[in-house]
UniProtKB/Swiss-Prot annotation:
Gene: rraA
One cellular-component annotation, GO: cytosol
Coiled-coil positions: none
A Pfam family that the UniProt record links to this protein: RraA-like
Family, per entry: Belongs to the RraA family.
This protein's record includes keyword Cytoplasm: yes
One of the GO BP terms on file: negative regulation of RNA catabolic process
Annotated organism of origin: Salmonella arizonae (strain ATCC BAA-731 / CDC346-86 / RSK2980)
Name of the molecule in the record: Regulator of ribonuclease activity A
Length: 161
C-alpha cells in the first residue's frame, strides 16, 4: 500500500505525531507503514536478526540505535532477511550500509546516515521498550507511516481508504 504522510497529516492532524526530519529513505519502497515493534540497541544488531526472523507482515521494526553513525545497524543481509519475512519497513535511528543493495529490496528503510562499518552481533539490546527520538516517544503497538516526505506516528491505525 502507498502512503502519503502529507495527506495523512492533513486528515489526522490532531491524531498523529510527526518525527523531526532526520531521516532519509534507503530502501526500495518509497512509502511504508504498519504496527511497530521497538528495539533499543547501540552499535550491535544481533537482536535485530532474532526479531527479523519472525513474520513481519503488517509490521515495522523501529530501532533506537542512539543516533550513532559510527557503525551500521542494517546491511543488505539483514534487510534481505526482513524482506523474506515480509516486514513492511525498518526505521533506524542510526546508520545503514550497502545502500546500493538496500535500494534494490522491496522494503522501506529509513535511517539517518550510511557508513561502511558494520555493527557488532552480540545481541545486546532490548525489545518492546519505550524509545524516544526525533521529538516523539514510540511504544510497541503504535502505528507508523513513512514516505520520502517524513515519518508520522499514531496510537491507532489510520483509516487510509
Amino acid at each position: 500500500m502507498k502512503y502519503d504522510t502529507s495527506e495523512l497529516c492533513d486528515i489526522y492532524q490532531e491524531d498523529v505525531n510527526v518525527v523531526e526530519p532526520l531521516f532519509s529513505n534507503f530502501g526500495g519502497r518509497s512509502s511504508f507503514g504498519g504496527q511497530i515493534i521497538t528495539v533499543k540497541c547501540f552499535e550491535d544488531n544481533g537482536l535485530l536478526y532474532d526479531l527479523l526472523e519472525q513474520n513481519g507482515r503488517g509490521r515495522v521494526l523501529l530501532v533506537d540505535g542512539g543516533g550513532s553513525v559510527r557503525r551500521a545497524l542494517v546491511d543488505a543481509e539483514l534487510a534481505s532477511l526482513a524482506t523474506q519475512n515480509e516486514w513492511e519497513g525498518l526505521v533506524i535511528y542510526g546508520a545503514v550500509r550497502q545502500v546500493d543493495d538496500l535500494e534494490e529490496l522491496d522494503i522501506g528503510i529509513q535511517a539517518i546516515a550510511a557508513i561502511p562499518v558494520g555493527a557488532a552481533g552480540e545481541g545486546i539490546g532490548e525489545s518492546d521498550v519505550r524509545v524516544n527520538f526525533g521529538g516523539v516517544t514510540f511504544f510497541s503497538g503504535d502505528h507508523l507511516y513513512a514516505d520520502n516526505t517524513g515519518i508520522i506516528l499514531s496510537e491507532d491505525p489510520l483509516d487510509i481508504e
